[in-house]
Amino acid sequence: MKILRGVSRQMCTSRPEVRVRFAPSPTGFLHLGGLRTALYNFLFSRQRRGVFILRLEDTDQKRLVPGAAEHIEDMLEWAGIPPDESSRRGGDYGPYVQSERLHLYTEAASSLLNTGHAYYCFCSNQRLELLKKEAQRSGHAPRYDNRCRRLQPQQVEQKLAAGVPAVVRFKLHTGTEEFQDLVFGWTGHAVGAVEGDPVILKADGYPTYHLASVVDDHHMRISHVLRGCEWLISSAKHLQLYRALRWTPPTYAHLPLLLNRDGSKLSKRQGDIFLQSFRDRGVLPETLLDLVTHAGSGFSDNRMGRRLDELIRDFNISKITTHSALLDLDKLEEFSRLHLQRRIEDPQQCVWLCEELKQMVKHTHSSEISAAAVLEPEYIERVLQLRKGHISSLQDLLSSTHSYLWVRPRVSQTQLQSESAHAKDIATAVMQMVLAGGSLVSMERLSSELKQISSRTNSTHSSVMKVLRLLLSAQQRGPSVAEMMLSLGEQEVCVRLQKALEL
């Protein structure tokens, strides 16, 4: 590999505008850890009227997953935190895919070679593997010995002319590189004292992360880099690269890791951490945003229930601690109930929920639907208002426990008689009560009138409730009988009670 010489260095430029980026590798689909990083970048940019960029770091071509790039942006849009600039949306600083920016990395590497900050390395994979094994045998961390630093210019030219495969390595200096991180404060790392010179451009012309991220952040005018703390030590290398290229580095903020509740790392092998999995289960996007921010820091208080506009308002980067954030997925149902309730209570959101649930009911129950009325917006909204706080997703209303809402139950005379000898008397008394009007006005009024049925039918209140639950739902458990009746409405309750009298 031969790099053209004589490329001019780009001088530093000012960056008055806040520009942040989420730069995942499309080697997999978006999971909760990536969502959290993207969200913090989004919140930071929105607070400062800045720009949120999606950049795809696809230089590791062997590990690319088909469809992952498109899926990542799909999930950001679904979560309500779409990028302002991306390969899909365009922008003034594209391309937004690293494999389409190779000429920029070649130019930067050439500049570093010309100024003596980088050099060609011709060491074979076999030699590098021997160095690694030798270090391990002696109990040291593997590192490159910088052998090719000492090659004379004539030797380099001869090897390049002979077509010997080469990479480009950056010369690390041994001093401590100090900088102020917005999360970790003043920090410094002497990477040159413990690591060998890193590869910045591979033999195939593709850059490594270190060069690509620096070049892209410069050319895309990134003002702040919010990324995982696993890159904290590498920042020392990046700052040396910025200095060598005479560019102004961005401000760094390294976010603590998002871990499982037991302290273990989130793994892509955990199928339940991918956003698509949550979406398929009917989890609302705002639930996940609230869950991942609640798991860590960045807010003055750790209350649950924040929606996106509240997250933007309350986010404070100075409140992010260096401690790992522990994700408790056992709380997902609680978060889901809260956010679904808030949607139900929002008139505009409730209209959307009603239509969504209608389509779900039609798909699930199709020809079994008891009457066209159960697909009317008024009926579905009534169901949602009565069930809010009890359900964590619309899919809960499609479970067998709630099938009575959409399908009339089948009850046999044997079932009815086994429940109570006064079953038909109970059905008659309740139907008369309903037809008299006024009983289905409120839960309190209905519950009060149902208590009077037991004395009128020589039955216990418990027996009355069991009979009504059977006739209305053919189930032994579920919502209260009063709620069932309010949900179904006067006409449907009477239809189901009349069926019992005809047995």
Swiss-Prot record:
Residues annotated for ATP binding in this entry: H31, E230, K265, L266, S267, K268, R269
Reaction catalyzed: tRNA(Glx) + L-glutamate + ATP = L-glutamyl-tRNA(Glx) + AMP + diphosphate; tRNA(Glu) + L-glutamate + ATP = L-glutamyl-tRNA(Glu) + AMP + diphosphate; tRNA(Gln) + L-glutamate + ATP = L-glutamyl-tRNA(Gln) + AMP + diphosphate
Residue span of motif 'HIGH' region: 26-34
GO cellular component annotations of the record: mitochondrial matrix; mitochondrion
Gene3D superfamilies: 1.10.10.350, HUPs
Residues that, per the record, bind L-glutamate: R21, F22, A23, E57, Y209, H210, L211, A212, S213, R227
GO terms, biological process: glutamyl-tRNA aminoacylation
InterPro entries, sorted: aa-tRNA-synth_I_cd-bd, aa-tRNA-synth_I_codon-bd_sub2, aa-tRNA-synth_I_CS, aa_tRNA-synth_I_cd-bd_sf, Glu-tRNA-ligase_bac/mito, Glu/Gln-tRNA-synth, Glu/Gln-tRNA-synth_Ib_cat-dom, GluQ/Sye
EC code(s) of this entry: 6.1.1.24, 6.1.1.17
Pfam families (alphabetical): Anticodon_2, tRNA-synt_1c
Predominant subcellular localization, coarse grouping: mitochondrion
Family membership: Belongs to the class-I aminoacyl-tRNA synthetase family. Glutamate--tRNA ligase type 1 subfamily.
Physiological role: Non-discriminating glutamyl-tRNA synthetase that catalyzes aminoacylation of both mitochondrial tRNA(Glu) and tRNA(Gln) and participates in RNA aminoacylation for mitochondrial protein translation. Attachs glutamate to tRNA(Glu) or tRNA(Gln) in a two-step reaction: glutamate is first activated by ATP to form Glu-AMP and then transferred to the acceptor end of tRNA(Glu) or tRNA(Gln).
The name this protein goes by in its record: Nondiscriminating glutamyl-tRNA synthetase EARS2, mitochondrial
Protein's organism: Danio rerio
Lineage, uppermost ranks: Eukaryota, Metazoa, Chordata, Craniata, Vertebrata
